Structures are given as C-alpha cells and as structure tokens.
C-alpha cells in the first residue's frame, strides 16, 4: 500500500512539474512586431509585402501542420486557376433584358493583373525562382451547348470586347475549330449538337503551394523572421497597450509559449473564423461560417493528359450555384501534367481538411446562430443542391465527365478529395443573415488585428487582397511617400485601373509575361460572331453562390 501511495505521489509530483514547466514556458514571452497565423499563401504574401515596406520589422509565422502550404494553398487542394474571368461564366451574369453585366469580370481581371505584377516583381528580386515551377501558360476556354447557352456566350463575348482586359479572346461555333482548340472535348460528340466556345491564349495554371513555399523560404533568410511549425494558437488576448498576447502550443512536446505582437494577421484559412472569435473583437460577432468541400476526378494517363491543353469551363445548370461550374483542366503539379475534372461538392463539419469534426459546432455562438438559421431557411435550393451532390454515385460523376469528355474511360480516372472552403455568413439588417461569396478582411478599429474570411477567388488574388488589408490597417503608412514608392515598385499599376487603357494593359501583360515566362502575343482583330438575341429572361429565384 505504501508503495502504491508513493508511486501515485510521484506521478502527481511529475504531472505537476510538467504543468508548471508548461506555464513557465508560456510565461516567457517572445516579442514580435508582426505575428502571421497560418502558413498559407495569404500570410506568405503579406509577409513579403511587409518585408519590403518595413525591412526592420520582426515577424513570426506559426503553422499548426508540419510544413507550410499543406492545406488550401496546396496545389492538389484547389483548382489552380489564375482566376481572371476569361472563362468563368459566373462572373458575367445575364440581366433580365438579356444583356450581360461585365463589371465583376473586369474587377476580377484587374485583381489578377496585380497578382501577376507582384509575382513578376518577386522573380526580379530573386524571391521567386524558376517561374515554370509555379505558373504556366494554359489557354482558358468557355464551352457551352444548346441554343440558349450559345446565345448567352455570344452576348458575353460581345460585351467583353468593351474592355481592354479581354482583347485577344477568340470565339467560335464551328466544331472543327473548337476540336482544334480542345480535341478531348469534341471527339465523339454529336456533330449536330449546337456548341460554342471562347478561347484566350494568355490563361494560366498556377501552383499556389509552390509560390507559398518559395515566398516563405525567402522570408526565412532574414534573421528577424521566425517560422514555428507544429504550433497551434490556443488563445488571443488584447493588452492594455493594444498589443496582443497570443498563446501558442507546441504540438510535438506539449509546451506552450506566449508571443506578444504589435499586429496580428489571422490567415489560417478555414480556421480563421474561430480564431477571430477567440480574439473577442466586436467585429467578429457579425460572422459565421459554413464548410463545403470539393472532389475532383484525376487522370494521369499520358493518352489523356497529352491530348488536352486547356482549362475548359462550362455553365452551371439551372438550380445550381453559379460558381459550381464543371471544368476539365490541364494542371501542372510537382512538375507533371495531369487533367482534373470537377468539382463535386462534399460536406463535412470540418473547417480544414486537417481539421476537427467539431469545427462547425464550436464556431456557432449566440451571436451568429440566428444569421445561420436565416441563411438555411432562405437558401433551400442550395441545400437541395448540396444534398444531391453528396448523394452522387461513381456512375453519376462519370456521366458528368462524359458531358465534357465524351470518350472518357473509367479506368483512366480516380477520385481526389480537395480542400475545405468555409463560406462567409454575415449578419444582415434586412434578411437576418446572408451567404457571401468572396473574401473579406475583418479588422478591429485600432488596426491591431485582421483576419481573412471566405474562399473565392482566393489564392489567385492574394496580392490585391493583402494590398487591401494594408490600406485598411496601415492607412497612414500607405499614404506616406515611402510606402507609395515601394508599392508602385512592387505593383507598377498600383493606384490606377488598366481597364479602358489599351496601351497600359498591353504594357503590363507584356512585362509580366516576359518575366514569368508566359505566352503573350498582341491581340489581333475581333472574331466576327452572329449577333446575339437579347431575349428577356424568365425571373427565377437566385441560388446563393458558393466556392468549391
């Protein structure tokens, strides 16, 4: 009995010692000017901006996984599209009178030009190396069938010619021409089927994971930058002097550490919402999140891969979210070409691919539960769509593939689970709550903490999104001559629009193409097309959009 008692006492002392050691460790504060939470492309991009703007600032990056760029930024966990609205039909909605609205498409394209300039600048500085390892020319195509959809694409093509950003786009309704552009899509197709396609040669495939790894590797070369892996944020507390004390747990040895930061960026992808809530800032109460995953069919068969060099986007079917458009894409991953088709929506309560099944429940609070309920009640069609996607069989997915690749063979394809996308739900005075497509920077009034919520267009516009964050949080510094000069060196078109300025558009595309090793030829004459018929559209209830 005495031995048992002694053993229990020893264990208790040992456990207490471990606890005291952890507390002691946590009490040893590390100080940093900027704390970047999350090792993805957003944190990497912001860190790279700040390294040029304020090279003396100290920075610490913490990532819960064993390496950077392993979640949504990983090349296999996203579609790898350089989103510039060249082919994504959801960015050009059709108005009630049949006309096409191009405002969103222009904004998306302008944003991607900023990303191209940012990456080109980093290549010139030696921060990014071997552009072909992370960006490649892959033509972007839209492809539709059926009289109404063909008429839509005619109208879209005509409308986009008003913008200098879309010069060089081709249009065809000829089977032979489209087969030349995308043989895999046309072979085996009914020759009587009414089809149409647009093609833009300057489209890109981007490996955002590789960009992230290279940016962070460059940051690590500086002595005032620290990267802590297998490190999970457990608490955020605002101090009286408006700095933040962030408690970080080492997932390998169980210890904890406090980091005192003047500015905190939460770029943790799906985990950003929960960390924003943990901060306790009032602005966090307006938000909730709803996770949606995506799956793709993948082919690595050389007979398939070598027969397709394009990203081909279709049109969402009636009753489906506009962003859910199927596409069959050439990808360049880990130096190898593959073809992906999808996405197919999946559902999990995880906010991250490597997250917890309790993520959705633990992010639900008394302040955001009502907006979530309103969104659910107001978007029954979206709920039906998600249920139908989850219920898809292997045969269903293969039949969807054959609409874009009529001669597809099952044995050439496997199913791949990509990343999670947490959709933004925001409190709304009129509707109670709304589902918001896109990304949103949420910060406190003092500009000491900011988080990025949302999923689309995401990584392809990391550079303009982080530029927006700088303007929102460091407004006084951004307006200073020093920061203005540096920002214009990083992004030559900063502060002005390219749209409408043909010479400026061509100049920037030529510059970024040369530096990034991309194809670019000055646009030729516009293709002649049948005049689109502007038919009044039936008024249908809009299906809320989501990012997959």
Swiss-Prot record:
Gene3D superfamilies: D-Amino Acid Oxidase, subunit A, domain 2, FAD/NAD(P)-binding domain
Cofactor(s), by name: FAD
Entry keyword annotation includes Cell membrane: no
Catalytic class of the enzyme: oxidoreductase
Single GO MF descriptor: 2-hydroxyglutarate dehydrogenase activity
InterPro entries for this protein: FAD/NAD-bd_sf, MQO
Catalytic reaction equation(s): (S)-malate + a quinone = a quinol + oxaloacetate
UniProt pathway annotation: Carbohydrate metabolism; tricarboxylic acid cycle; oxaloacetate from (S)-malate (quinone route): step 1/1
The EC number(s) this enzyme carries: 1.1.5.4
One Pfam family here: Mqo
Lineage: superkingdom: Bacteria
SUPFAM superfamilies: FAD/NAD(P)-binding domain
UniProt KW keywords: FAD, Flavoprotein, Oxidoreductase, Tricarboxylic acid cycle
GO BP terms in the entry: tricarboxylic acid cycle
PANTHER family: L-2-HYDROXYGLUTARATE DEHYDROGENASE, MITOCHONDRIAL
NCBIfam families cross-referenced by the UniProt entry: mal_quin_oxido (TIGR01320), PRK05257.1-1 (NF003603), PRK05257.1-4 (NF003605), PRK05257.2-1 (NF003606), PRK05257.2-4 (NF003608), PRK05257.3-2 (NF003611), PRK13339.1 (NF009875)
UniProt similarity note: Belongs to the MQO family.
Protein name: Probable malate:quinone oxidoreductase
The species this protein was found in: Escherichia coli O6:H1 (strain CFT073 / ATCC 700928 / UPEC)
